[in-house]
Amino acid sequence: MKNNLLFTEHKLGPITLRNRAIRSAAFENMAYGNKPSQDLYNYHTAVARGGAAMTTVAYCSVTRSGVSFDGQLYIHDEIKEDLKKLTDGIHAEGAKA
């Protein structure tokens, strides 16, 4: 494929993406106990390793009462390190998170 834009680097505001392939957010149902699991980590790092420029973790709640489903992330102080591990893993594979 001559000059296929999908595989070219792209600037998105201040962020430079290695290509234009982005995995959009979808409900993975892998946040067991409403926190990032090893399955969630493995899934998103595999997407990044596969060549996606960016992967978006599924929607999450900012309050306990906002949790709609089991397996949905709930942002609170106790999971900051888990989220950092997930983000660092995605970045280590060359993708944005």
Name each model feature, range by range.
Residues 1-97:
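Flavin-dependent oxidoreductase catalytic cores
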